[in-house]
Amino acid sequence: MQSWSSAPVPIVPGRGPELRLYDTADRQVRPVAPGNTATMYVCGITPYDATHLGHAATYLAFDLIHRLWLDLGHEVRYVQNVTDVDDPLFERADRDGVDWRDLAAQEVALFREDMAALRVLSPHDYVGATEAVAEIIELVEKLLASGAAYVLDGEHPDVYYRSDATLQFGYESGYDRDTMLGLFEQRGGDPGRPGKNDALDALLWRAARPGEPSWPSPFGPGRPGWHIECAAIALSRVGSGLDVQGGGSDLIFPHHEFTAAHAECVTGERRFARHYVHAGMIGWDGHKMSKSRGNLVLVSGLRAEGVNPAAVRLGLLAGHYRADRFWSQQVLDEAVGRLQRWRAATTLPAGPDAAAVVARVRQYLADDLNTPKAIAALDGWATDALDYGGHDEVAPRLVASTIDALLGVDL
C-alpha cells in the first residue's frame, strides 16, 4: 500500500541523550536501546471514517520517537498497518450503500493527506491487512499445528487462539481476569460465544459468511481476525524483538496483549517488543473522541476551515503524550499564538545563544517525550529573543531547525 511523502528532516548539530520511554508492561520509564536500525510497529486506522484528533495525537507521539531516533543517528524501520477488512468498515459501507473496498480506499487517501499535512514522517512499510492475508494464514497454520489454536465446532468453523497458550499472557496490560473480560466485550471480543474453550479466547480466522469477503485457506475460506493481522505483518516485516510496539491506550487490551501473545507463541520469545508504548486519549465535549460516539474533531475539517496544520500539531504536542487530555478552542488559540511568536523570534537577524536551549529540548524529549517542558524551553528562548534581542546570528536558524527536526513544526 502506498504511504505518503515526508518533508526532509534537518540535521541539527550535536547529539542528545539516549531515549527513555514509559513501558506499559514494566510500568516504568526505562532506556530504549536499539541497534543501528531502530524498529517500531504502530497500529494504523480502520478506514471507515476520517482522521480525528485522537488518531492524530497518537501518530504524532510515535513521530517524535521516529525523529529522536533519526537525531541520534539510527536508521528507522517503521511499520504501520491498515485494518482494511473489519466489521465496522463493512457496516459503514453497507449503511452508505458503497463497496467496502471503495470506502477503505477513500478514507486511506484522506488519512495520507492528513498525515502529510501534519508532517508525520511516513512509515517504511504501510501495509493493508488485505495485502498480508498469505502471511496471516501461515501464522494461523503455525498456531493450529502447535495446539495454540483450535477450530470451533458448528455451522461456522471459526479458528480461535487459546488465551492460555503462553504462560506470560497478561503481562503487558497487567489486568486481572474480570477487567480483561469487560474490556474484551467492549472492544470487539466475544466472551459469550458458545463452544469456546475459554471466554477470553480470541478469534484468529472468521469462517466465510454470506455477503462478507473471504479468502481461501487450508482451514476453510474466511477472513482474518483483528489481532493476528498485526502479529503477522510485524513478524513478516521486522521480525520479533521490536524496539517499540505502539498505539493508543485503548489498544493495550485486548489488541496489543493478543498481538504479542500470537507472536510469542510462534517465536518462543518472552517478549514480542522491548517497549510497549501507549498514547493517551483526546477528549472533546466531555468524552473521549471516538468514531462510535461521533464527538469528532476531524483533521480534514480543521484544514478545510483554514486552520494551519502546524498549529494543530503544536496544540496536540502541548500536552504530554501519555496524558488523557481535552482539545478545545483555547488549546488551538494558544498554539496559533505560540506559532506566531516562534516565527517572529526565528526570523530575527540575530538572537540569544541557542546551544543551551537546543540541549534542553533534546534532554526533555529524550525523557519520555516531555513536550510540555521542551515547548516551555523554546517559549523562554523566543521571549528573550523578542524582548531583548541577541548577537548570535546563527541562533534563530538553529532554533528553527531544531523545532523542525525534533518537533516536526515547520516555521
Curated annotation (Swiss-Prot):
Binding site residues for Zn(2+):
43, 230, 255
Disulfide bond residue pairs: none
In chain numbering, motif 'ERGGDP' region lies across: 186-191
Biological processes, Gene Ontology terms: cysteinyl-tRNA aminoacylation; mycothiol biosynthetic process
Q: Where does L-cysteinyl-5'-AMP bind?
A: 43-46, 58, 81-83, 226, 248-250, 282
The enzyme's main class, written as a single word, is ligase
Q: Where is this motif: 'KMSKS' region?
A: 288-292
Q: Name one GO cellular component term.
A: cytosol
Q: Which cofactor does it need?
A: Zn(2+)
Q: Which reaction does it catalyse?
A: 1D-myo-inositol 2-amino-2-deoxy-alpha-D-glucopyranoside + L-cysteine + ATP = 1D-myo-inositol 2-(L-cysteinylamino)-2-deoxy-alpha-D-glucopyranoside + AMP + diphosphate + H(+)
Key words of the record: ATP-binding, Ligase, Metal-binding, Nucleotide-binding, Zinc
| The EC number(s) this enzyme carries | 6.3.1.13
MF annotations from Gene Ontology: ATP binding; cysteine-glucosaminylinositol ligase activity; cysteine-tRNA ligase activity; zinc ion binding
How is the cofactor bound, as the UniProt entry phrases it? Binds 1 zinc ion per subunit.
Q: Where is this motif: 'HIGH' region?
A: 45-55
Give the matching HAMAP family: MshC
Spell out the subunit comment. Monomer.
Purpose: Catalyzes the ATP-dependent condensation of GlcN-Ins and L-cysteine to form L-Cys-GlcN-Ins.
- Which family is this protein grouped under? Belongs to the class-I aminoacyl-tRNA synthetase family. MshC subfamily.
- Which PANTHER family does UniProt cross-reference here? CYSTEINE--TRNA LIGASE, CYTOPLASMIC, CYSTEINYL-TRNA SYNTHETASE
Return the protein name: L-cysteine:1D-myo-inositol 2-amino-2-deoxy-alpha-D-glucopyranoside ligase
Organism, per UniProt?
Mycobacterium marinum (strain ATCC BAA-535 / M)
Gene that specifies this protein: mshC
